[in-house]
């Protein structure tokens, strides 16, 4: 982990005007400029070609093919001991009207290795990535070194879409040094040195100056009433991401109890016996409700279980009205009072039975509907439907083709080995045939001489 800093000047130190110094801001330990291939092409290189600003200007500009790779560190905006640097570079065409590029330096040349790799976002082609290795000396006798460069360039689609025809004006180069042959490893990162960070003044964390204001700014005109209304409205909103609250069923039960209490208050003045009967009925209904499994309550629609309660309240209100009508002439005579009391008790009992039957009918309504509407058997098709195979994605097709290519290469090698073994066997048999033929000729000569 090296000490990294960001130079503010846009030109290399050699091109800096006299009398001006480059102001560097150190990055905090652990922070490195390590973007992905897609970010390098679609953000940094694209904005450089189009002349748009970037949020964190960490890539310097240099003619990379006019300098040796070990001399490029001084032109980097990230002053670090890590063996990895990023640069913008203008391409130098070898011929004016050709497509070949001149990648030769004073003491060597950059040689492309392998095929150019595509940089895609899903199926959209963003750019191309070329891998080059630095060779010291002159071709074709150059000596391979451990300096590697990844050259990123835009494709014509990106530039035509933005109305720019100079896609080859700049390329983005990532230069790094490997200690051994093979894929790059973590040895490009310099070790951490604690003495370099004795004072953390001026340490920068990229993006730390971005402040997100999650709360709205206060209103200066002093409309307190409007603010209170907005807050109350925001509290009354229901968040669909929150789990169902357990207080919703309790509110309904408390509402039901309050409603029953309000319905029973007039009957306290009319008849004490009727009040006792209704109180027992209410307790019995509450016990039945507690014994039943709790019904699911929807948070978005709290009025889901209310139709049953409204039905019960309507039946009880009708019974209360009947009882009040029956007890209007309570003071007329003793016989009338006794008859009205009997009628009130019977009506309240009938109302209770009606409410209980309504509960049973409501709970069994779904079962009866299912019994009344049996499922019709499906008619068999005359012809079986062909199985629908899912469409394979382009990535799966590419993987299948790669597997087939690998399998074909393995089979080809196997055939080569079998052919070589067959040729060896044929040569052995041919030598045996020649030996037998020669022996046969010698035997013929001996027989002829003996005769």
From Swiss-Prot:
PROSITE patterns referenced in this protein's UniProt entry, alphabetically? NAC
Domain called NAC: residue spans: 27-178
Tissue specificity, in the record's words, reads: Mostly expressed in floral organs, and, at low levels, in other organs.
**Coiled coil start-end:** 272-292, 398-446
Gene3D superfamilies (UniProt xref): NAC domain
Task: Write down any Gene Ontology CC term.
Answer: nucleus
Summarize induction of expression: Induced by type III effector proteins (TTEs) secreted by the pathogenic bacteria P.syringae pv. tomato DC3000 during basal defense.
Tell me the keywords, alphabetical order: Coiled coil, DNA-binding, Flowering, Nucleus, Plant defense, Repressor, Transcription, Transcription regulation
Q: Where is the composition biased (Low complexity)?
A: 318-337
GO biological process annotation, one example? DNA-templated transcription
Quote the biased-composition stretches of kind Basic and acidic residues, using this chain's numbering: 256-270, 370-384
Subunit structure comment from the entry: Interacts with JMJ14 and NAC050.
PANTHER family cross-referenced by the UniProt entry: NAC DOMAIN-CONTAINING PROTEIN 86-LIKE (PTHR31744:SF210), PROTEIN CUP-SHAPED COTYLEDON 2-RELATED (PTHR31744)
* Protein name as catalogued: NAC domain containing protein 52
Identify the gene encoding this protein. Answer: NAC052
């Amino acid at each position: 982990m090296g000490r990294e800093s960001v130079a503010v000047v846009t030109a290399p130190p050699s091109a800096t005007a006299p009398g001006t110094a480059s102001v560097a801001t150190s990055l905090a330990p652990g922070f490195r400029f390590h973007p992905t291939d897609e970010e390098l092409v679609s953000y940094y290189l694209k904005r450089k070609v189009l002349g748009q600003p970037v949020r964190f200007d960490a890539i310097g500009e240099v003619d990379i093919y006019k300098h040796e790779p070990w001399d490029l560190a001084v032109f980097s905006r990230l002053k670090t001991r890590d063996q990895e640097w990023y640069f913008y570079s203008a391409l130098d065409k070898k011929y004016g009207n050709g497509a070949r590029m001149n990648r030769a330096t004073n003491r060597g040349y950059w040689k492309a290795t392998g095929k150019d790799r595509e940089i895609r976002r899903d199926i959209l082609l963003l750019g191309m990535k070329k891998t080059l290795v630095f060779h010291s000396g002159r071709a074709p006798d150059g000596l391979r070194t451990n300096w590697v460069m990844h050259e990123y360039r835009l494709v014509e689609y990106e530039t035509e879409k933005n109305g720019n025809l100079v896609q080859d004006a700049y390329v983005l180069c990532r230069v790094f040094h490997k200690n051994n042959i093979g894929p790059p490893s973590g040895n490009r990162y310099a070790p951490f040195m604690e003495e370099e960070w004795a004072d953390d003044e001026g340490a920068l964390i990229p993006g730390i100056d971005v402040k997100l204001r999650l709360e709205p700014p206060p209103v200066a005109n002093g409309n307190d009433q409007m603010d209170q209304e907005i807050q109350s409205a925001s509290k009354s909103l229901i968040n669909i991401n929150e789990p169902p609250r357990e207080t919703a069923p309790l509110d309904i039960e408390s509402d039901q109890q309050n409603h029953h209490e309000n319905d029973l208050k007039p009957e306290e003045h009319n008849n004490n016996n009727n009040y006792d009967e209704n109180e027992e009925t209410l307790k019995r209904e509450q016990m039945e409700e507690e014994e039943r499994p709790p019904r699911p309550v929807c948070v978005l629609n709290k009025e889901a279980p209310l139709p049953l309660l409204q039905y019960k309240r309507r039946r009880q209100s009708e019974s209360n009205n009947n009882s009040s009508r029956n007890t209007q002439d309570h003071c007329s005579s003793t016989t009338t009072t006794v008859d009205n009391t009997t009628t009130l008790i019977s009506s309240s009992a009938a109302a209770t039975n009606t409410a209980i039957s309504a509960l049973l009918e409501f709970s069994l309504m779904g079962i009866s509907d299912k019994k009344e509407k049996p499922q019709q058997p499906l008619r068999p098709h005359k012809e079986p439907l062909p199985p629908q195979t899912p469409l394979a994605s382009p990535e799966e097709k590419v993987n299948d083709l790669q597997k087939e290519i690998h399998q074909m290469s393995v089979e080809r090698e196997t055939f080569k080995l079998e052919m070589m073994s067959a040729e060896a066997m044929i040569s052995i048999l041919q030598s045996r045939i020649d030996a037998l033929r020669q022996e046969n000729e010698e035997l013929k000569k001996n027989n002829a001489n003996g005769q």
